[in-house]
Amino acid sequence: MSFLVLPPEVNSALMFAGAGSGPTLAAAAAWDGLAAELGQAANSFSSATAALADTAWQGPAATAMAAAAAPYASWLSTAATRALSAVAQAKAAAAVYEAARAATVDPLLVAANRHQLVSLVLSNLFGQNAPAIAATEAAYEQLWAADVAAMVSYHSGASAVAAQLAPWAQAVRALPNPTAPALASGPAALAIPALGIGNTGIGNIFSIGNIGDYNLGNGNTGNANLGSGNTGQANLGSGNTGFFNFGSGNTANTNFGSGNLGNLNLGSGNDGNGNFGLGNIGDGNRGSGNVGSFNFGTANAGSFNVGSANHGSPNVGFANLGNNNLGIANLGNNNLGIANLGNNNIGIGLTGDNMIGIGALNSGIGNLGFGNSGNNNIGLFNSGNNNIGFFNSGDSNFGFFNSGDTNTGFGNAGFTNTGFGNAGSGNFGFGNAGNNNFGFGNSGFENMGVGNSGAYNTGSFNSGTLNTGDLNSGDFNTGWANSGDINTGGFHSGDLNTGFGSPVDQPVMNSGFGNIGTGNSGFNNSGDANSGFQNTNTGAFFIGHSGLLNSGGGQHVGISNSGTGFNTGLFNTGFNNTGIGNSATNAAFTTTSGVANSGDNSSGGFNAGNDQSGFFDG
């Protein structure tokens, strides 16, 4: 199994086991001695034959002897030089090993981290160790990344040392002996064929269009990538920008999943570091749709919350609006219980501070239901206002477990989302940490697709910008797995190419066919900086559209959008809409998401009024 996917327990143990650099240094000393012996032999042989030819041995026989002996003397000198080169390379190999071993995490440190995790988990009876567990896991991920980085450096350095070793068979061929070609035959004498086309670099096997070394895939810019369209090093996947990502469409380092923007995330669509889940904004979250850090649950807006839809820090429970609450739908601080309105209360439905007991069904006013501490709610356990549903700590939501405002769905910590588990705002889908996305698992903004950490993409797993297609880490491409820019086709690491697998920059204005303007890729686009098919950019800005048949102002993403700009999805008109068939103008830079809405700052479907969630509101 490749060291790229091995845990630090294995990589550290392998690096610290064995004989170390001692045998390599001993080999260097042996080669040094051999070089000295060969050099002395060459000098002695040359001196002896020259002395014979100049003094005692004359005539045609002496001339023939001198002619036959000269190649052997030359071969001895060449062998001595080769031996000295082997000395240098052996010492270089030892130095590479020592540097890698110094960079590798000590196995005892890895064991201590795992022991600490076990201790924290066993004593985590009430969830009090959740932040410490998250920190320990984040430290473990850093140990993993450090070991992989050390091994990648070791592999690269050792490969470079090996590449500089000259085969001894070349020296054997110089001997005046009929058997020399036979001695030089075999694997050592075979030239390694070029097992790819259009690559710039070495060791790119069965691949095209790479710039860099040892890539197994196509269209990468960087080294040791296993996949296509990556910009960076040692990525296992496609369309990544960064180092050692295990997945696709990530921007940054050491992510396990897709569409993450940040480091050490396990999941998809996270914007931050060390998250485990889907669509989180912040660091160290475990769950989905959280905005903040070290939350455990869904749609928490704050930090160190355990539960869902809490708005504040640190709460344990559901739909609490405030700080240090333990329970459900408390509005205030330091409450223990359900639907308390105030501070420091223990009980249910209490209104005021420092109270113990049971109050009204609803502590708020104008509610229809039970356990509402907010106002004008229809449903259960809402601490926000004007909600239809249950467990909402935000305002004007239609659904449940929303800590943001004006959402239609559940588990949204952002605003005006139609869907679930969105930490961003204005999304139509689920698990998006970015804004105005149509799809799921996007940490970037205004994408239509899945797992994009870039922006304005129509497609999936893009870490670049304004691409139509999938797995692009470059910008303004129409196609697949391009790490270069403004390409039409696939696997290009160069710019402005049409076709497949070119690492070269072309001296043209556009790629593709039938484009009018500058910086376009695809087919029959007009204006500047479009990707896709038959888009028309009439906006004042350089950035155009991605997708198919978009027109009007810039930055439309998807199919057949028109209007003044920033529409994402299908058949939208107006400004800043996400979804299908919306026509809101959003003059105040608000966002509308959903289906067939004409009102501003709305979510859901078929809403004509402003600031609406749900369906069919005027």
UniProtKB/Swiss-Prot annotation:
GO process annotations (BP): response to host immune response
Keywords: Signal
Signal sequence range: 1-29
Transmembrane segments: none
InterPro entries according to UniProt: Mycobac_pentapep, PPE_dom, PPE_sf
Keyword Disulfide bond: no
Residue ranges of the region described as Disordered: 598-618
Protein family (similarity comment): Belongs to the mycobacterial PPE family.
Stated name of the protein: Uncharacterized PPE family protein PPE16
Gene: PPE16
